Amino acid sequence: MFVIKRNGYKENVMFDKITSRIRKLCYGLNTDHIDPIKIAMKVIQGIYNGVTTVELDTLAAEIAATCTTQHPDYAILAARIAISNLHKETKKLFSEVMEDLFNYVNPKNGKHSPIISSITMDIVNKYKDKLNSVIIYERDFSYNYFGFKTLEKSYLLKINNKIVERPQHMLMRVAVGIHQWDIDSAIETYNLLSEKWFTHASPTLFNAGTTRHQMSSCFLLNMIDDSIEGIYDTLKRCALISKMAGGIGLSISNIRASGSYISGTNGISNGIIPMLRVYNNTARYIDQGGNKRPGVMAIYLEPWHSDIMAFLDLKKNTGNDEHRTRDLFIALWIPDLFMKRVKDDGEWSLMCPDECPGLDNVWGDEFERLYTLYERERRYKCIIKARVVWKAIIESQIETGTPFILYKDACNKKSNQQNLGTIKCSNLCTEIIQYADANEVAVCNLASVALNMFVIDGRFDFLKLKDVVKVIVRNLNKIIDINYYPIPEAEISNKRHRPIGIGVQGLADAFILLNYPFDSLEAQDLNKKIFETIYYGALEASCKLAEKEGPYDTYVGSYASNGILQYDLWNVVPSDLWNWEPLKDKIRTYGLRNSLLVAPMPTASTAQILGNNESVEPYTSNIYTRRVLSGEFQVVNPHLLRVLTERKLWNDEIKNRIMVDGGSIQNTNLPEDIKRVYKTIWEIPQKTIIKMAADRGAFIDQSQSMNIHIADPSYSKLTSMHFYGWSLGLKTGMYYLRTKPASAPIQFTLDKDKIKPQVVCDSEICTSCSG
């Protein structure tokens, strides 16, 4: 039996050679648990005549990955095999890879079709010796197997469908794409990215340095006008943004309701549902980022709109397809008055914006005055109990996980962009709160800090966190200036207001590394101090940039220009970790370069790349299933697996018990200290999660993607959570509602072959916000 080598030559299969290759990659791993011969034997079983060495490496990596539940070092070995394979298939020098990408010729038409931009190529040519010399390829081997596979699938650039970039090449491309001729800053950014201190958002990783360097994640639009022209002009904007890999939030509260008169045609409106069907089909038609993910939009509506009940049914699995838009996400922009009426079991008037104009343009007391005026003038379409609408909201959430909920008054009251006008919607992932109008499309550029990295020698390094945040602020400001904007209205907005969004990933990992239970007082205190540090560092860096380049155009009249920062709007006094008053004085003197700074986003894909838990979330399970080409296998929380292995507590019985219990360790006989630290989201009081969101909210000047997890949701449970979040002043009340399946098959045995652990969804619904 023979294999085909990379050079095309045939060679007889040699077991010892396969074993030797695997053994070479086991350096530094626990040899008591890692068995190269076992891996090699399984590889031999999968061999066929004419198999390539590339295919052998791929198989060996997958086999090693399937052994991860035996020892965490198998995951490292799997990644090393896969990355070593890539290194053998790609050029080493960064400059040569960039040349290949620039010199690409389309094989179908013979035309020069560069993948990277001419300016990127010019910079690389000028500084190639320096750039080539600072890249450290060993850092590629720090990715775990699934992080690397995520990069391989969507992030590393290809020529004729063959990957040509290594992870380090990608990171240097991103750094050079952002900083261009400022080569020292590019190298600083490269090192921080490759050491995993932070990551830029997916669109930045996809597109930095390329010919279409669209690096922004989020776009927020208002419907231009309640007319055919306005609706279709807005649709075109959405299509152009979606084409360039942007996630969209769209407010439609100004579109007239069904049954309303249309004076131009002397007809009757069909309302928002047929219009949204058109938007739904546009989202389906456009594949963002060259099939890296499908087009996605979140549609925002205020609950006084008389089409609200039909809107709440849009994503349901049953019902007439003519009244469904299952490819759009639905979201509510809820005024406080509605919550008060629900709380008091009051009546609620449903209105048409054509007959009751201006409700979407006002908030707070002004909204209440206008709304109650329209009620007194009997301009409403109908009156129903507020709780009827509320019940429909809860039912939709239990069935579909949506609508997302944001509180209009909190979003406007606590926004540093309040001086611009009324904010009417958020984005696709509910963490961006920015002003938009008919002439401006709000944009946000994102990055996320890997909090686990800052746990050094058993303590959290706040000073290092602040320093990294300051680099991120400088980077995101450069992105604003050099970005390719899909539409001019987005460029106008972004350069006037200069908002950015700094988020986090690995909060749960940081707590685990410090041995803090997620719901402990220590974790709750650290949660506040982390976000206080991020906000402080971001303000400090933005003020420094303003000193050099001037404040953003619309700074005058903002809260910050009057010495009011986010925590002041929450009536919170910061800790004594940082000295706030001198910073406020500096801001009064020089201003800020950015209107907004902090926005914890979901980090779905980038957290997987870096091997961290997502965003600010606790772990949802301690064991889950991954799907690969060779089949399915189980992955255990790596922190748990390591501690159990070190304490000689890991065995098949424990593994099977965790699988039977859906990823929980609470029913095992493990020590109590381990049980406390490794609680899943389902075992942590949801009100603690919401309280921690409010605690950090005082230092988040945008908002945060906050999911609500209720294993078995009911009207009363979900209502209680929503009203608790609203009462604490949250801007985002809920991103998704996450639930457990209604029933699970009865487990009659602990036989691992008969146990179905939680399957991780590999959907990339919100890659655009994965910072």
From Swiss-Prot:
Q: Where is the active site?
A: N427 (proton acceptor), C429 (cysteine radical intermediate), E431 (proton acceptor)
Q: List residues binding ATP.
A: K5, R6, E11, N12, V13, M14, F15, D16, K17, T53, D57, K88
| The keyword Lyase is annotated on this UniProt entry | no
Where dTTP is bound, by residue?
D226, S227, I228, K243, R256
The protein's matches in InterPro entries, at most eight in alphabetical order, are given as: ATP-cone_dom, NrdE_NrdA_C, RNR_lg_C, RNR_lsu_N, RNR_R1-su_N, Rrm1
Give the enzyme's EC designation. Answer: 1.17.4.1
One Pfam family linked to the record = Ribonuc_red_lgC
ATP-cone domain: residues covered:
1-92
Disulphide bond pairs = none
Partners and quaternary state? Interacts with RNR2/OPG047 subunit.
What name goes with this protein? Ribonucleoside-diphosphate reductase large subunit
